């Protein structure tokens, strides 16, 4: 009888079941740990069940990481750049219905630059930059290594023609204040 019991699901099996593949799942786990380590959040969750949000139109949004502060919630998406544009647009539209700040984390800067940045730009074009600006939408994009250094590679503020590229920002606010 004891041999007929199903074995306990290990972490790897659970992550693959919940996130489709190990790379995406373990990157979510790493992103959550980086966000916990900042000390900015009361809670950080990667629970698909706990993070599920049913939208008014009946669609479901399940952010990869949900971070709670005392008076706000932030939603983070880990992206490997494998979505078709229509699926990515759908994901962004769901997110913008629950938050004004869309946070995307990629595996590396190459994926941020060559996969996610173009997808974000196409989504912005499909919605209309002015409409997103009026809605107060801002999109943040970075790699996991830049997130660990607490910086965003790109910020799409819907005001400027191009996203703000933090990587190329050489200004130093301390020096500016002293001059």
Per-region residue spans from a language model:
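Interdomain/boundary linker segments immediately adjacent to catalytic/signaling cores
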Residues: 1-33, 178-179
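Extended hydrophobic/Leu-rich segments
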Residues: 3, 12-15, 53, 120, ...
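Non-catalytic C-terminal interaction segments of nucleic acid-processing enzymes
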Residues: 86-107, 111-179
């Amino acid at each position: 009888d004891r041999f007929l019991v199903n074995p306990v699901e290990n972490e790897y099996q659970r992550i693959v079941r919940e996130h489709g593949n190990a790379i995406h799942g373990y990157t979510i786990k790493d992103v959550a740990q980086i966000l916990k380590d900042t000390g900015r959040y009361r809670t950080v969750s990667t629970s698909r069940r706990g993070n599920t949000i049913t939208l008014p139109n009946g669609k479901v949004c399940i952010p990869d990481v949900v971070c709670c502060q005392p008076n706000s919630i932030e939603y983070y998406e880990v992206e490997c750049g494998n979505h078709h544009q229509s699926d990515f647009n759908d994901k962004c539209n769901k997110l913008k219905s629950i938050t004004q700040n869309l946070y995307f984390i990629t595996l590396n800067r190459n994926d941020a630059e060559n996969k996610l940045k173009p997808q974000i730009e196409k989504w912005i074009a499909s919605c209309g930059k002015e409409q997103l600006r009026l809605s107060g939408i801002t999109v943040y994009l970075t790699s996991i290594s830049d997130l660990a250094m607490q910086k965003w590679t790109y910020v799409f503020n819907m005001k400027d023609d191009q996203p703000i590229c933090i990587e190329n920002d050489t200004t130093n606010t301390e020096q500016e204040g002293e001059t």
